[in-house]
Every structure is written in C-alpha cells, then in structure tokens.
UniProtKB/Swiss-Prot annotation:
Residues 399-412 have a biased composition (Basic residues). Pfam families: NPIP. PANTHER family: NUCLEAR PORE COMPLEX INTERACTING PROTEIN, NUCLEAR PORE COMPLEX-INTERACTING PROTEIN FAMILY MEMBER B15-RELATED. It comes from Homo sapiens (Human). Residues 252-262 have a biased composition (Polar residues). This is Nuclear pore complex-interacting protein family member B15.
Length: 443
C-alpha cells in the first residue's frame, strides 16, 4: 500500500515539475506531439527526437497496471492521463509548436538539436529567450504582447482622429486652399488623368478608321516628297502593312547608273577592276550595221512636194469684196444719259445766283509788310536818367527833439519801453499838428 502511494505521488510530482518521467513523456509525445502545457515535455535525451512506437507504450501501460493490481488506482491513473491529454489539447503551447505540420516539426527538431531550443524575442523584456527549462515564453509574455498591440492601435487611431480634426479646422478657417487654388488643382488633376488615360487606353477601331486614312495619305505624301520609306511617327497598323509590302523608293545614289562612279566613291575602289557587265561591248555596237526600219525613207517623203488639195468652201471667201463697201452708221440705242449733256434751266439759274468765289492771290502778288529796320545803338534816343540831388539840396527833415523820461507818460510803460519808442512816430505827429495850425479856418 505504501509502495503504491509513493508511486502515485512520484508520478504526480513528475507531472507537475519541469522534469517529467519517461513514461509521461512518451505518452505526451505519442498523443500530442511537440506540446507542453506548463511543463517541459520534450523527448528523452536518450531518444534523440525519436517518437516511441505504440507497442512500447502499450507494454508500459500493461506493466504499470499489472504492478499496481488495484482497480481504483488503475481508474485514477487513466483518469489523470485523460485529464492531462484534454488540458494539453485545450490550452496553448508555450513554445508555439503544436505539431500542425510535419515540416514545422522537422524544422524544430533540427533546430533543437543545434540550439537546444527555439529562440524568440520576449515582448516584456525585449530580450532573446529560448525554450529551455525555466526560461520559457509564458502567458505573461502573451498578455504583454497583446497589451502592446492594443496600445499601438489606440495611438494610431488617436493620431488619425487628431489629424482629421486639424485638417477640418484648417479647412473651416480657410488655411487649406482657396477657391481659386482648389479649382486650379482640380483642373491640373483632370489634365493629368486625361494624359494618363491617353497613354493607357486603346483607340477603338471605329474611332481609328479616319485617323488611319489621314495617316496613310500624310505618310504617302511625306514618302514621295522626302524619299523616305515611311514617316516614323505615323505607325498605324494598316500603314505598317502597306508600307511593309512596297519596296523602298530609289535614292540619289541608287539612281546613278552602275558604270558611272559616284563622287562619294573612295579612291581605293578605283584600283580594283570592275566586274564584267553587258555594257562592255557598247563600242562595237555602233560599228555594226543597223537593221532596216520604217523610218529610213522618212527623208524621201519630206523632199517630194505634196499635191495641192482644194479647200472646202467657206464664208470668208467673199471677205475682200465686203471690206471695200462702207458700212452704214448704226444708231445707238436710247439711254438715260442722253439728257445729261445740257443741264436744265433750274440748275443754270442756281449756278448764276451763287456769289463769285474770291480770287486766290499768289504768293508773289501779296504785299508783304515792310520789316522794321534795325537801328544802331548811336541812333537810338537814350532816355534821360534822373538827376541825383545833392544832400544839401534835399529837404532836410527836422530832427526830432529828445525828450526826457520824466515828460513821457510813464503810467503804462516802464523805463525800458520808453527808451524803445520810435522817433519817426513822434515826428509824424508833430507834422500833423503844424498842418492843423497853418490851415485856414472856415466859418
């Protein structure tokens, strides 16, 4: 009983701890390959990644059940095994390998034999960690990764909202584009799209027919005028086919005869003998007698005078007789201009009543006004200059008498103002007084 109890505890401790027993490891690998739920379930070091066969697993289970010999323990063991398998199936794997494909398993096994575990980056510590025992990527790192993603998404959404709000605010305040700039921008965009469509879209045959005809005629004219096989810018399908069939026109160099040498022929070509041609015997041909032809007797026909043939009767035979007879004058048909030679009487009277026009004098007949003669400086009468009177002859004005300050009215002025009194004002006052005294009194 004690042995069975300690065996059960040993199995449970091996399940909970990070060092599982070979039995549990083999069971886990057989049922759930490459998974560990909270435990470091991996192949036994002695197995080197090989999965035990189902026969070995069955033998181990039979040995355990036969060794325990109790139905209760067997039921408990099977129940715990099924629970562990169920939990491993539900929960995620910590090292990220759930055995979904054989390729991943092989890659992980080859990498495990080289590095003894997978290496990845922990989102919490930002360090590279491996799937060794005690240093696994756990649930905490998964939660941290999820929080990090959520924070990043929130920041992006907030940035988009702020940008939208700013753009809308600027558009309201008129900081984005004015109506004129917006119209010009839209026009430029439309022209750019039309240019792109022109290069991208194909012209339908219905719209291409008149273009082909015009292109064909223009290319033909260009070809005949310039001597080129075709116009390189006119590349319609019909024009290509037609121009491809026709031979190229003769150029200036090809139009020269073969026996004549061009000016552009290099001097080296003159030294080599030319190939034999049909024109080599052209000198012998004029010496040989020509065969008789119809034109040989042409000179004889020209020397023999032709017999006169009578002309047919014509209307002009009696023209000489008619010229000597004078023609009678033929009266002209009446017209409206016959009465314009003699003007009517009313017009003559109106012209007689008009005043005669003044006679226009010639330049020679007009009396020119005499020009004033230029006199010398001696002949000009000088205006008499005013005589300068002497100082003695000039009327001497009486000098104003100096009065004392005591006689001045010092009621409203000070001594300084009394000194600055103008003497000429006093003189004028004195003259006025004298005039009043000498003036006769009238009754």
């Amino acid at each position: 009983m004690r042995l069975r109890f300690w065996l059960l505890i040993w199995l449970l401790l091996g399940f909970i701890s990070h060092q599982p027993t070979p039995v549990i490891n083999s069971l886990a690998v057989y049922r759930h390959r490459e998974t560990d739920f909270g435990v470091g379930v991996r192949d036994h070091p002695g197995q080197h990644g090989k999965t035990p066969s189902p026969q070995k697993l069955d033998n181990l289970i039979i040995i355990i059940i036969g060794f325990l010999r109790r139905d209760t323990f067997t039921i408990l063991f099977c129940t715990s095994y099924l629970c562990v398998s169920f939990l491993k199936t539900i929960f995620w794997s910590r090292n990220g390998h759930d055995g979904s494909t054989d390729v991943q398993q092989r890659a992980w096994r080859s990498n495990r034999s080289r590095q003894k575990g997978l290496r990845s980056i922990c989102m919490h510590t930002k360090k590279r960690v491996s799937s060794f025992r005690g240093n696994k990527i756990g649930l905490k790192d998964v939660i941290t990764l999820r929080r990090h993603v959520e924070t990043k998404v929130r920041a992006k959404i907030r940035k988009r909202k702020v940008t939208t709000k700013i753009n809308r605010h600027d558009k309201i305040n008129g900081k984005r584009k004015t109506a004129r700039k917006q119209k010009m921008f839209q026009r430029a965009q439309e022209l750019r799209r039309r240019a792109e469509d022109y290069h991208k879209c194909k012209i339908p045959p219905s719209a291409r027919k008149p273009l082909c005809n015009w292109v064909r005629m223009a290319a033909a004219e260009h070809r005949h005028s310039s001597g080129l096989p075709c116009w390189p810018y006119l590349t319609a399908e019909a024009l290509k086919n037609r121009m491809g069939r026709q031979p190229p026109p003769p150029t200036q160099q090809h139009s020269i005869t073969d026996n004549s040498l061009s000016l552009k022929t290099p001097p080296e070509c003159l030294l080599h003998p030319l190939p034999p041609s049909v024109d080599d015997n052209i000198k012998e041909c004029p010496l040989a007698p020509l065969p008789p032809s119809v034109d040989d007797n042409l000179k004889e026909y020209l020397l023999v005078p032709l017999p006169p043939s009578p002309l047919p009767p014509s209307v002009d035979d009696n023209l000489k007789d008619c010229l000597f007879v004078p023609l009678p004058p033929s009266p002209l048909p009446p017209s409206v201009d016959d009465n314009l030679k003699t003007p009517p009487l009313a017009t003559q009277e109106a012209e007689a009543e008009k005043p005669p026009k003044p006679k226009r004098w010639r330049v020679d007949e007009v009396e020119q006004s005499p020009k004033p003669k230029r006199r010398r400086a001696d002949e000009v009468e000088q205006s008499p200059k005013p005589k300068r009177q002497r100082e003695a002859e000039a009327q001497q004005l009486p000098k104003p008498k100096r009065r004392r300050l005591s006689k001045l009215r010092t009621r409203h002025c000070t001594q300084a103002w009394a000194i600055r009194i103008n003497p000429w004002v006093e003189k004028k006052k004195k003259i006025k007084k004298q005039n009043k005294t000498h003036a006769p009194k009238t009754n």
